[in-house]
Amino acid sequence: MIAKKILYWYDNNKRSLPWRVNCTSIKKEYLTIVSEFMLQQTQVATVIPYFNNFLRHIPNMASLAKVKEEKLLKYWQGLGYYSRAKNLKKSAKMIVDNHNGRLPNNFLELKKLPGVGDY
């Protein structure tokens, strides 16, 4: 009963955010992992313009896995905590190489990704 109320409240009050769009599940996974890494230690309002710019230049998991570090850090510039960007790229490479470009579907595999851990 409480879950229904929470979901109802969310449907009526959720914020419109660029990573909450209708898209394919593969794209949704990419938007989610990029946003989660960017949101570590950073407020939503700060992340949004960086997120949008990042996606213009690095639009999917495969391109993230292959991007040169210099370009990666250029598109991350201003967010700080550059280890997040480096871990995001390492995670993307592992996802592409070991999981056919899809996020692992279990908790233990997710925790093996650099920069992913308990909340």
Predicted stretch roles:
Residues 1-113, 119:
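N-terminal polyanion-binding entry modules of DNA glycosylases/AP lyases
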